[in-house]
């Protein structure tokens, strides 16, 4: 069969498509130089996907980093084996990306599609990349034998995509988070706004109140006795491996240290339960608690977001938005964001089949959207 290729309307000079018939033929022939990338939400991927495909997903709030070019494609894979497989084969294999249907692309808006952006980045990195005409739905309808389906899944594969998880046809918003990405400890004064202008002058020089008892700050805040006294802080959660607990021997403060570096290889999520318990202990004793790392924009933010997710029953996006409204220069590293996504699924917050009802009607309204959040039960009394 002759390979069917045609220019993609939104980027004809850089991206071409493959038909589902062509892909079926390659799978029938056992082509071992074919790398399939499923760009749908993870729930849909786990429910059913084309055989041998690997899933690539990204939180909606991280799209700006992808657009700015601060992330290599390999960084989008949350599973190490998928990342390694992509790294080994992307330079030699034919890479085919697919979303659910690839039907909404056109010359005017397709260039803003994340799938289109990913195609461009793959081309820039030297990959032979294509998109699948009609996407997964068309391939499954015509060649279901080459689809792997999880019959034990609790959610239907027809559930609507979750925007926080999938790439697919998501559009890049100018309101996305700032594009700071580093595997090293970062200086909060180096943060920039979406247009590249510094944020340092607008950032507070003291801990930021996230909840009436919960404060987010940097290492400097943890060494300022006047600040600690002003905010009634008696508990200090130090999310670094090497910064000292300065007043530990004085007996006036209770410390907990989480020995994690700001690096993609670190597993911060394993410490979520004890960090959340420590924060709750401070709340129970009507004490303020400071969560800090070095710069106060990555590790400490990740822990704070995890706390809000569990205690307020929030999705990662909503919890992140609350923190960002209070402190605009936050920038957790990409791997920590992936761990928050896993935590979201563990809490059952991302499942379309989750019909849990909050036990208490206690509310907090975030100005960034119309969602209503439980928070009164977390306020110190």
Swiss-Prot record:
S-adenosyl-L-methionine as UniProt keyword = no
Q: Name one GO molecular function term.
A: MAP kinase tyrosine phosphatase activity
GO biological process terms on file: cell differentiation; negative regulation of ERK1 and ERK2 cascade; negative regulation of MAPK cascade; positive regulation of apoptotic process; regulation of heart growth; response to growth factor; response to nitrosative stress; response to xenobiotic stimulus
Amino acid composition bias (Polar residues), ranges on this chain: 189-203
Keywords in alphabetical order: Cytoplasm, Hydrolase, Protein phosphatase, Ubl conjugation
What residues sit in the active site? 293 (phosphocysteine intermediate)
Protein name (record): Dual specificity protein phosphatase 6
Species of origin: Rattus norvegicus
Q: What is the lineage of its organism?
A: Eukaryota, Metazoa, Chordata, Craniata, Vertebrata
């Amino acid at each position: 069969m002759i390979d069917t290729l045609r220019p993609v309307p939104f980027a004809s000079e850089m991206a071409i498509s493959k038909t589902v018939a062509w892909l079926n033929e390659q799978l029938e022939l056992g082509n071992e130089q074919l790398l399939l990338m499923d760009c749908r939400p993870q729930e849909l991927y786990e429910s059913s996907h084309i055989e041998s495909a690997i899933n690539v997903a990204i939180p909606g709030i991280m799209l700006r980093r992808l657009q700015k070019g601060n992330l290599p494609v390999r960084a989008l894979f949350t599973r190490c084996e998928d990342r390694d497989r992509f790294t080994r084969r992307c330079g030699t294999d034919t890479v085919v990306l697919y979303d659910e249907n690839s039907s909404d692309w056109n010359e005017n808006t397709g260039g803003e599609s994340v799938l289109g952006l990913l195609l461009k980045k793959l081309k820039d990195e030297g990959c032979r990349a294509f998109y699948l005409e009609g996407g997964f739905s068309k391939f499954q309808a015509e060649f279901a034998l080459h689809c792997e389906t999880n019959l034990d899944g609790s959610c239907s594969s027809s559930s609507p995509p979750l925007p926080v998880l999938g790439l697919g046809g998501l559009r890049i918003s100018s309101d996305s988070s700032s594009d700071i990405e580093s595997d090293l400890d970062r200086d909060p004064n180096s943060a920039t706004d979406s247009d590249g202008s510094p944020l340092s002058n607008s950032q507070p020089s003291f801990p930021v109140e996230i909840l009436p008892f919960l404060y987010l700050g940097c290492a400097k805040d943890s060494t300022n006795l006047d600040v600690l006294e002003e905010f009634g802080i008696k508990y200090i959660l130090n999310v670094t491996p090497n910064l000292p607990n300065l007043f530990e021997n004085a007996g006036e403060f209770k410390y907990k240290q989480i020995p994690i570096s700001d690096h993609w290889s670190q597993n911060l999520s394993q410490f979520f339960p004890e960090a959340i318990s420590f924060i709750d202990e401070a709340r129970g004793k009507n004490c303020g608690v400071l969560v800090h790392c070095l710069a106060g924009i990555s590790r400490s933010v990740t822990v704070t977001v995890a706390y809000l997710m569990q205690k307020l029953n929030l999705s990662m996006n909503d919890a992140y938005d609350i923190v960002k409204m209070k402190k605009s220069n936050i920038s957790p590293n990409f791997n920590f964001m992936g761990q928050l996504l896993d935590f979201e699924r563990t809490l059952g917050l991302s499942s379309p089949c989750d019909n849990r009802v909050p036990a208490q009607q206690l509310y907090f309204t975030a100005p960034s959207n119309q969602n209503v959040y439980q928070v009164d039960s977390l306020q110190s009394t």
